[in-house]
Amino acid sequence: MIRRLIFALFAWSAALPAAAQTAPTPAPNPRVALETSAGRIVVEVYLDKAPITAKNFLRYVDQKRLDGIVFYRTVKVADHFGFVQFGVQNAPTKMLPPIKHEPTSETGVKHLDGTLSVPRLAPGTARGEFTIMLGDQPSFDADPSKPGDNLGYAAFARVAEGMEVLLKIFDAPTSPTKTLQGSFKGEVPEAPVKIVTARRLAPSD
């Protein structure tokens, strides 16, 4: 009896470290629905891999700063290859402070088809403008072998649903003459698609 009790206590105590080392299941990454005038796009936001850039995007979503904005730029390099851009267009009432740059060499999030990224000037100047890749764009990734500013752009999310909507936006005609404050000639859509609302989805959605 005593021997069985000692064995049981030993087995119980031996199991404690294994139980203590069991890691909790990480929370799923947030998903955001962009309800546009062309249809719904759902993006998975990589809060686990690019937390600074992901949190910045989610602040714009949660504060409803993306409601009513448009896809104002389409860069068509080739058939279904390039990117579309949306954001607050530097509107003072909608902009939040700039964020620290997270290069792809640190996050591991590459500029692949359907990836969301943030435009910038110098590192640490990104704010409320966002791009979505059509096709893989490795030239946007950090490349330490290049001279000068080789940190690339910060990728932070991907399209989980609605690539057909994104393609519809990309394929829409652009104006040969329109510009935005003198820039992006030939890249401004004739009829920009509006983001009606941008909202987080519940995990079960």
Located regions from the model:
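Sec-dependent signal peptide recognition
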Residues: 2-8
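Cyclophilin-like peptidyl-prolyl cis-trans isomerases
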Residues: 18-205
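N-terminal signal peptide c-region/cleavage motif recognized by signal peptidases
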Residues: 13-17
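Intrinsically disordered, low-complexity sequence elements enriched in Ser/Thr/Gly/Pro
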Residues: 1-2, 29
